[in-house]
């Protein structure tokens, strides 16, 4: 099992290219099921999760051409040989569940296992299923599988989500592209990745308006066509590297960064005393901190355009070194402070009270062996390790590989002393 060895204390200096967005790529790949024509995706991130999904698509009959190391992925779902997504594959990653709607929209039926993925609270798929039912799908849940049928096709519906859900918004939008009539989504999520998906689907011939606002309208069409589409840059990866540079100190420029999508994070870094130069026209973000003490900043995670839950763990790692006390409130997912006890092993002073964490800044973190528990938690330990004194070992980094492309290479190119090793946990 791989692990990362990090010798902290080295400031970072250089440029880091931002990869394609995992959270966008996973939904874009599923869109191939809606057409019998080939699709080419560029700027596709090479991640464990995107590779898992490619394997599932192959099981369904999609032709996948995606050479190792390439950022261009070709998908052709001309002939689907199966509409069953088995537990063995769906359990590896929650986003696999999103094949359900497109399969029903195109084939009239599907059987898909309930999802797996990061162990972050309950994260139910009720909203997904309620939306499909509203569009006329007949659903049964049996032995861990959702069996769905819409023999005469899906029908447009007026759907008002009881809570804001990125996954349910995207899933319903995918299915509605081929439904008869108009589907209106109210209380829709507004994340940039939803806009990215809508842009791609519209390029394929869909009729979607309002993506990025709380009300999305989808006029169903008879068929979608193939296209070539570039995956948007990953705002979570960009934010992660920004916080790594702020924690370790130094001068790092992020190239190809989605500046407009990171307003909340940029504001919090500036509030914490970090110098941030963001250039939307050039798609660059420059992070500088040379000896300036960090200030404690409190925040609550919120749906976009608020502070993203997927950057909460990274920001907590940064706040462990700030002067003062910060309160971090998690409002999106339950049980998303699993990184707190591992950060405490490095000397952080964190008290978790339900959905709230109180972080009292310390003068110095000290290296220790730690264990990754989920994707974002794992990278928070890397950030802390870059700032800690001594050698930190991060075990179980398979979580990290699910969402970060060549992390150690990108950090290493900026002067981080970080190395991947194989073998037993330390």
Curated annotation (Swiss-Prot):
GO cellular component term of the entry, any: cytoplasm
Name of encoding gene: murA
First-listed, main subcellular location of the protein, grouped into a coarse class: cytoplasm
Protein name per the record: UDP-N-acetylglucosamine 1-carboxyvinyltransferase
Active site: 118 (proton donor)
UniProt keyword terms in alphabetical order: Cell cycle, Cell division, Cell shape, Cell wall biogenesis/degradation, Cytoplasm, Peptidoglycan synthesis, Pyruvate, Transferase
Binding site for phosphoenolpyruvate: 22-23
Keyword set includes Transferase: yes
Chain sites annotated for binding UDP-N-acetyl-alpha-D-glucosamine: 94, 123-127, 310, 332
Subcellular location: Cytoplasm
PANTHER family registered for this protein in UniProt: UDP-N-ACETYLGLUCOSAMINE 1-CARBOXYVINYLTRANSFERASE
GO biological process: cell division; cell wall organization; peptidoglycan biosynthetic process; regulation of cell shape; UDP-N-acetylgalactosamine biosynthetic process
Higher taxonomy: Bacteria, Pseudomonadati, Pseudomonadota, Alphaproteobacteria, Hyphomonadales
Reaction catalysed by this enzyme: phosphoenolpyruvate + UDP-N-acetyl-alpha-D-glucosamine = UDP-N-acetyl-3-O-(1-carboxyvinyl)-alpha-D-glucosamine + phosphate
Organism listed in the record: Hyphomonas neptunium (strain ATCC 15444)
One of the Pfam families matching this protein, by short name: EPSP_synthase
2-(S-cysteinyl)pyruvic acid O-phosphothioketal: residues bearing it: 118
UniProt keyword Transit peptide, yes or no: no
Biological function: Cell wall formation. Adds enolpyruvyl to UDP-N-acetylglucosamine.
E.C. no: 2.5.1.7
MF annotations from Gene Ontology: UDP-N-acetylglucosamine 1-carboxyvinyltransferase activity
Pathway: Cell wall biogenesis; peptidoglycan biosynthesis
Similarity-based family: Belongs to the EPSP synthase family. MurA subfamily.
């Amino acid at each position: 099992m791989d692990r990362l060895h990090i010798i902290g204390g080295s400031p970072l200096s250089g440029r880091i290219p931002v990869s394609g967005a995992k959270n966008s790529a996973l939904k874009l790949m599923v869109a191939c099921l809606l057409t019998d024509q080939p699709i080419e995706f560029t700027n596709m991130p090479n991640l464990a999760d995107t590779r898992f999904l490619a394997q599932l698509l192959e099981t369904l009959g999609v032709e996948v051409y995606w050479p190792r190391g390439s950022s261009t992925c070709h998908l052709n779902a001309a002939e689907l040989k199966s509409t069953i997504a088995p537990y063995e594959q769906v359990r590896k990653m929650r986003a696999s569940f999103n094949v359900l709607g497109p399969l029903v929209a195109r084939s009239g039926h599907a059987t898909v296992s309930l999802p797996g993925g990061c162990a972050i609270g309950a994260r139910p798929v009720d909203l997904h299923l309620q939306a499909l039912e509203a569009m006329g799908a007949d659903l049964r849940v049996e032995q861990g599988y959702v069996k769905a049928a819409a023999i005469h096709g899906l029908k447009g519906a007026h759907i008002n989500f009881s809570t804001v859900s990125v996954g349910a918004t995207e899933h319903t939008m995918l299915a509605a592209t081929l439904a008869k009539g108009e589907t209106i989504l109210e209380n829709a999520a507004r994340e940039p990745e939803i806009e990215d998906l809508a842009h791609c689907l519209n390029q394929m011939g869909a009729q979607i308006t309002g993506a990025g606002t709380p009300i999305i309208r989808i006029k169903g069409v008879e068929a979608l066509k193939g296209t070539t589409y570039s995956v948007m840059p990953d705002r979570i990866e960009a934010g992660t590297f920004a916080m790594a540079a702020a924690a370790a100190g130094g001068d790092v420029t992020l190239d190809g960064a989605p500046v407009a999508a990171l307003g909340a994070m940029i504001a919090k870094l500036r509030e914490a005393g970090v110098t941030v130069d963001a250039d939307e026209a050039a798609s660059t973000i420059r992070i500088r901190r040379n000896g300036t003490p960090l200030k404690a900043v409190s925040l609550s995670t919120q749906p976009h355009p608020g502070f993203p839950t997927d950057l909460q763990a990274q920001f907590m790692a940064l706040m462990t070194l700030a002067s003062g006390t910060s309160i971090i409130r998690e409002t999106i997912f339950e049980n998303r402070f699993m990184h707190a006890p591992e950060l405490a092993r490095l000397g952080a002073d964190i008290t978790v009270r339900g959905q709230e964490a109180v972080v009292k800044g310390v003068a110095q973190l000290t290296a220790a062996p730690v264990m990754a528990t989920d994707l974002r938690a794992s990278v928070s330990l890397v950030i802390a390790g870059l700032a800690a004194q001594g050698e930190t070992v991060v075990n179980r980094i398979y979580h990290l590989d699910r969402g970060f492309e060549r992390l150690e290479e990108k950090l290493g190119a900026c002067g981080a002393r970080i190395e991947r090793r194989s073998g037993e946990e330390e």
